[in-house]
């Protein structure tokens, strides 16, 4: 479906420079876009790509348009002789692109008819809205509530007493255990598990060494998981239920694939967590935080609002102050790494030598005096 720039601006805002009747039917990167596609410039370092792009129109920030020779809604020297002549000027081209992309997906995706697939298993006490879409081999246990316009794809499991909020979409084989609350418009991708038991075991051992006897005693996890509105959870991510109170994911949190969130954690609103991060139990993460891929956060710590943890960093203590924190070792040339590792191994010997030299110098100074 093709849309005019005028139609896009009417829906999403912004200002048009060029032909308001220019039509676009999709989106593409600057260096690949054709005359029927809309591109965007989010980073000024790619400004040169705008000048050579074949895009029909470009989403661009005001300051970047000025660098191309246009300002105040009109081209200063007439139509451009190279590159696009049509622009939508907006303060945040990246976010604008995301909204337009979502609109094109929605337009291209035929709505699924409401109803329950014959192979689904639904307990008679469960409440399923008439507008919900229940796919093949879905299981909905006793007392569960499936709200309006929810879509449960093939193989989804919803445990007893769990609530799935309106407009949510659970992709194939996602599992939400008993006693969980999923807010409206949640997106839970394939294979994610919400509400499995937290990792809680009490040690019950006596003796030492080979004479040690006993075992680990499982601590029942009687809390649940409470997820706010507009949360997205990636494929194969696991969020453990609380030991006594709920694990809480606040509004608009975005969690990537294969993330582990331990029991009794609280993740603040608008925080984003990249893939393979691990967050141990009873940790609180503030609002608007960013957790990099494969970062590890110890249990029982608190991160304040607007904290950024870079990829592969390890957090072992609370970080209440906003800022960027790094503990990962970036990749370097293999030979350089080996030399650095050798130095690290010998740091204790170097320290001892320095102490010995300082002691000798101090003694010599005393003798000279």
UniProtKB/Swiss-Prot annotation:
What Gene3D superfamilies does its record include?
Answer: 1.20.5.170, Hexapeptide repeat proteins (2.160.10.10), MurE/MurF, N-terminal domain (3.40.1390.10)
- Its Enzyme Commission number(s) read 2.3.1.191
Q: Which Gene Ontology CC terms are recorded?
A: membrane
Q: List the disulfide bonds.
A: none
UniProt GO BP = lipid A biosynthetic process
Alphabetized InterPro entries for the sequence: Hexapep, Hexapep_transf_CS, LpxD, Trimer_LpxA-like_sf, UDP_GlcNAc_AcTrfase_non-rep
A single GO molecular function, which one?
Answer: N-acyltransferase activity
Q: Which UniProt keywords apply?
A: Acyltransferase, Lipid A biosynthesis, Lipid biosynthesis, Lipid metabolism, Repeat, Transferase
**What reaction is this protein's catalytic activity?**
a UDP-3-O-[(3R)-3-hydroxyacyl]-alpha-D-glucosamine + a (3R)-hydroxyacyl-[ACP] = a UDP-2-N,3-O-bis[(3R)-3-hydroxyacyl]-alpha-D-glucosamine + holo-[ACP] + H(+)
Q: What does this protein do?
A: Catalyzes the N-acylation of UDP-3-O-acylglucosamine using 3-hydroxyacyl-ACP as the acyl donor. Is involved in the biosynthesis of lipid A, a phosphorylated glycolipid that anchors the lipopolysaccharide to the outer membrane of the cell.
Q: How does it assemble?
A: Homotrimer.
Protein name (database record): UDP-3-O-acylglucosamine N-acyltransferase
Provenance organism: Burkholderia vietnamiensis (strain G4 / LMG 22486) (Burkholderia cepacia (strain R1808))
Gene name linked to the record? lpxD
């Amino acid at each position: 479906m093709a849309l005019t720039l005028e139609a896009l601006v009417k829906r999403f805002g912004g200002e048009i420079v060029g032909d308001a009747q220019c039509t676009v039917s999709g989106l593409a990167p600057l260096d690949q876009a054709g005359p029927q596609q809309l591109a965007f410039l989010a980073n000024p370092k790619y400004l040169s790509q705008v000048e050579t792009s074949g895009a029909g129109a470009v989403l661009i920030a005001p300051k970047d348009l000025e660098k191309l020779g246009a300002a105040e809604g009109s081209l200063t020297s007439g139509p451009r002789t190279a590159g696009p002549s049509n622009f939508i000027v907006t303060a945040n081209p990246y976010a604008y692109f995301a909204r337009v992309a979502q609109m094109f997906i929605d337009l291209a995706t035929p709505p699924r008819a409401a109803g329950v697939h014959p192979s689904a298993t639904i307990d008679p006490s469960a409440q399923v809205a008439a507008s919900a879409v229940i796919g093949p081999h879905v299981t909905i246990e006793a007392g569960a509530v499936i709200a309006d316009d929810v879509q449960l794809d093939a193989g989804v499991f919803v445990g007893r007493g769990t609530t799935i909020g309106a407009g949510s979409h659970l992709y194939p084989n996602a599992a939400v255990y008993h006693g969980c609350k999923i807010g409206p418009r949640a997106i839970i991708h394939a294979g994610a598990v919400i509400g499995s038991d937290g990792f809680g075991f009490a040690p019950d051992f006596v003796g030492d060494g080979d004479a040690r006897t006993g075992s680990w005693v499982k601590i029942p996890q009687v809390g649940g998981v409470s997820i706010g509105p507009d949360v997205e959870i990636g494929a194969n991510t696991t969020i453990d239920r609380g030991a006594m109170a709920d694990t809480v994911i606040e509004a608009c949190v975005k969690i990537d694939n294969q993330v582990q969130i331990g029991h009794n954690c609280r993740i603040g609103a608008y925080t984003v967590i990249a893939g393979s991060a691990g967050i141990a139990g009873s940790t609180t993460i503030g609002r608007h935080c960013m957790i990099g891929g494969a970062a590890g956060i110890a249990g029982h710590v608190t991160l304040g609002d607007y904290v950024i943890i870079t990829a592969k960093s390890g957090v072992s203590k609370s970080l209440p102050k906003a800022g960027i924190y790094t503990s990962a070792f970036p990749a370097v040339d293999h030979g350089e790494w080996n030399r650095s590792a050798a130095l690290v191994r010998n740091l204790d010997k170097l320290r001892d030598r320095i102490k010995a030299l300082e002691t000798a110098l101090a003694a010599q100074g005393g003798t000279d005096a």
